[in-house]
Structures are given as structure tokens and as C-alpha cells.
Amino acid sequence: MDTFQVIILALIQGLTEFLPISSSAHLILPAELLGWEDQGLSFDVAVNTGSLLAVVIYFRHELWNMFTAWIASIFKGKQSDDSKLAWWIILATLPAVFFGFMAKDFIETHLRSAEVIAVTTIVFGLLLWWADKMSHQDLTVYQTGWRKALLIGFAQALALIPGTSRSGATMTAALMLGLSRDAAARFSFLMSVPVSLGAAILVGKDLSESSLPIDYQALTLGTLVSFVAAYLCIHYFLKIISRMGMTPFVIYRLILGAVLCGFIFL
């Protein structure tokens, strides 16, 4: 890949990973418009690592408090709001892990298509709009509870379907269950840490077993660009939803889905 392609793809990954707009839908567009080939496993690992570092650094205080409280709950039996939140995040991760292993081959074979991505981009955009407008949103992230956490976890598993958007599915479920917009976004961001880490490890394992050449300069640039884009995305997204809600992202998803349908069916 040349430098321009690295920057564009890393920007797409960083900007769309944490927005409820589907990163897979956006990664189709460069291929359709510019004829770019698949970027390969090594680049996937690099840009995912950049996004993971962004959320870890942005929420470093919350994550550290959760980690220390979680350790205390195990070894000292001390329960706190942060330890409960840590356990809920772990619980919410389990459905995606289970269904990821069980349905990986089926998804890769039958659902990873432009048609599926176009349809899910529109359908789950409408669900996000409904959840944002119709649900009663007053719970904080510390009021989630294990039942709601598990249901949000199943929504995250549903996002294994390309075009759904992990952030979009989890935020939609959280809003439907009564979490505030800020709480829904924060819970979704925190949930991304174990999932992204696990995915990076699995893809990294596949990469280590591959004999393909590695362009370390491109990977370094991709990681850096993805990190900066994702960090800024998280910061400004939290500000936008506090003022405008999810409507801008719903409109964007509908337009994007229509554009994809145009490329596919016209």
C-alpha cells in the first residue's frame, strides 16, 4: 500500500470504530470507488491496535479504577460501583466471544457481502433512531445491572453481522434499556476494550503463522493515524450526543446505506 492509501484506511478505521455508523460499510467505499484491494491481516492488526490504544488512554482513569476495584473484589471480597461495572463489562463480553467462535465461518461465508452491509446499515440505523427517540433514558453507567449488561452483550454479538456496527448495536440496546446517551456511549466504549484486545490477539496469531511480507513503516503509520482519529472521535462524539442525540448519525447511516445500495443495485 502507498502512503495515501494507508492514511485513508487508517482514518476510516479510527473515525468509524467508535461511531454508530459501521466501519465495515465505510471500508467498502474505497474498494468500490478506487479499486483498492484488501489491506491484509497485518494492517488490520495495526489499525485495530491504534483504536484500542485510543480508548484505553481516553478512559485510563475509569479503566484503572475498574481494574483495581475488580482485583479487590476477587481477593478481598470488597464490592464497589467500579468493581460491579468491571464484572458487568466482562459479562457483556461473553456473548460475542461465544457466538464469534460458533458463527465465524457462517458469517464469513454467507454474510460478508456488500448487499448485507447495505441493508444492515439502513435497518440498524432506523433502530438507533427509534431507541434514541422513544426510550426512557435516565440511568447512569453504574446503574446498568447484570441483566442489562448481558442484553447489551447479546446486541454486541449481533454486531458480528457486517454493517450492523458494534457501537451502534450496543448503544441502541443500552438506550432501549433506559441508559442515558452518555452512559450508553461510555458502556459501549468500555465494552470495546476486551473485544478489541481479543480480536487483536486472534488476528495477530493468524499473522504470526503467515509467511506474507510485513511493511513495518506502513503499519506504524496506520497505527498512529488510527490512534489519533479514534481518540478525537471519542472526545467529540460524547459532546455531540449530549447536545444533538443520535439523529445526525442516523441520518448519516441512511444516506450511506442508500449510497451503497446505489453502487450495488444500479
UniProtKB/Swiss-Prot annotation:
Membrane topology category: Multi-pass membrane protein
One GO cellular component term noted in the UniProt record for this chain: plasma membrane
Principal location: membrane
GO biological process: cell wall organization; peptidoglycan biosynthetic process; regulation of cell shape; response to antibiotic
Keywords, in A-Z order: Antibiotic resistance, Cell inner membrane, Cell membrane, Cell shape, Cell wall biogenesis/degradation, Hydrolase, Membrane, Peptidoglycan synthesis, Transmembrane, Transmembrane helix
InterPro entries reported in the protein's UniProt record: UppP
Keyword match Repeat: no
Entry annotated with the keyword Repressor: no
Compartments where found: Cell inner membrane
EC code(s) of this entry: 3.6.1.27
Transmembrane annotation, as ranges: 1-21, 39-59, 87-107, 111-131, 149-169, 183-203, 218-238, 246-266
Catalysis: reaction(s): di-trans,octa-cis-undecaprenyl diphosphate + H2O = di-trans,octa-cis-undecaprenyl phosphate + phosphate + H(+)
MF annotations from Gene Ontology: undecaprenyl-diphosphatase activity
Role: Catalyzes the dephosphorylation of undecaprenyl diphosphate (UPP). Confers resistance to bacitracin.
Annotated family: Belongs to the UppP family.
Miscellaneous comment in the UniProt entry for this protein: Bacitracin is thought to be involved in the inhibition of peptidoglycan synthesis by sequestering undecaprenyl diphosphate, thereby reducing the pool of lipid carrier available.
Protein's recorded name: Undecaprenyl-diphosphatase
